[in-house]
Regions:
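Extracellular cell-wall/glycan-interacting regions and their flexible linkers
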Residues: 1-8, 62, 66, 110
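Catalytic glycan-binding domains that act on GlcNAc-containing polysaccharides
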Residues: 17-24, 73
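Substrate-binding/active-site groove segments that recognize
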Residues: 22-42
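Alpha-helical segment that forms one wall of the substrate-binding/catalytic cleft
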Residues: 40-71, 76-97
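Conserved small/polar residues in nucleotide/adenosyl-binding loops
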Residues: 114-116
């Protein structure tokens, strides 16, 4: 799976909402799972939400790559799973999956799945 397929998978999993809503954690959310930040104005159309999605997705890729710095040979599929996780939980949240990250560093993909 390439990164564009991952991007589309994230969109599908998150779903799309034009109007903001409270997510299960109580945060004001909209578009493709974008958590509204303090002082941020919600877009009024799909194009505006896409801009936020692209920014959020780029941050997820950067966050995943930072977490995977010690995994230079990681398979694309595993990297893309970490990108999806970072999109949903943030890099800090995913950093708590220490067993998974260590298994990825060791290229033990089966063990990494156990730690998710």
């Amino acid at each position: 799976m390439d990164i564009n397929q991952t991007k589309e998978a994230v969109k599908k999993e998150e779903g799309y909402r034009l109007e903001t809503y409270k997510c299960t954690e109580g945060h004001l959310t909209g578009g493709y799972g974008h958590k509204m930040l303090e002082g941020e104005t919600a877009p009024t159309d799909h194009a505006g939400w896409l801009v936020l999605f692209e920014r959020d997705f780029a941050r997820a890729v950067t966050g995943a790559d930072d977490l995977l710095m010690l995994c230079p040979n990681i398979k694309d599929t595993a990297r893309n799973i970490v990108v999806e996780m970072v999109y949903q939980m943030g890099a800090f949240g995913v950093s708590k999956f220490k067993g998974m990250l260590k298994a990825l560093q060791d290229e033990d993909y089966k063990l990494s799945l156990i730690h998710i």
